[in-house]
Regions:
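Extended alpha-helical rod segments
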Residues: 1-165
């Protein structure tokens, strides 16, 4: 009986490690997707800026205004998606705090970047700027956000460097 319990505990431990690895891979996938979309949205904003050069919001056609409204909404939705990923990271960090402090520390670094730079807030601000035809400012913010997302991705992708085993 004791041997079976030992095997069961070991299997549960291994299953937990596999689950943790899957969670990390999911975080990498999700942050990579958000970063890729952020870069696409930045390119779209840049094209909007070129197309509307020298015109105020009042001088835009209804279709152009609607196009900017949709672009701003997409940016805001992407901010919400990032918040969802960060919330999942927070939960995982709490679970790992005691049993795997190194992995919890890696997640803390990633979360800290997002919080210190107020990434989701900046993304929402960029969305509002797009809707208000403040495309130059929106572009700068989008570029900064993308750079921070790439930093987060780098930390997550290289987490094995932080491990001692």
């Amino acid at each position: 009986m004791q041997g079976q319990e030992s095997v069961i505990r070991k299997l549960e431990e291994l299953l937990g490690e596999v689950s943790e690895q899957e969670d990390y891979q999911r975080f990498i996938h999700d942050i990579r997707r958000v970063a890729s979309l952020q870069d696409q949205y930045r390119e779209q904003t840049q094209q909007l800026q070129v197309d509307r050069l020298g015109r105020t919001a009042d001088q835009l056609t209804d279709e152009e205004k609607a196009q900017q409204q949709r672009a701003g909404e997409r940016q805001t939705e992407l901010a919400r998606q990032l918040e969802d990923v960060l919330n999942r990271m927070l939960l995982m960090r709490e679970r790992l705090q005691e049993g795997d402090p190194i992995s919890a520390g890696v997640l803390s670094q990633v979360i800290a970047i997002a919080q210190q730079q107020a990434l989701s807030g900046q993304m929402r601000e960029s969305g509002r700027d797009i809707e208000r035809n403040r495309l130059g400012h929106a572009l700068r913010v989008q570029l900064e956000v993308h750079e921070d997302l790439v930093s987060m991705l780098s930390i997550l992708s290289n987490r094995h460097e932080y491990r001692l085993d």
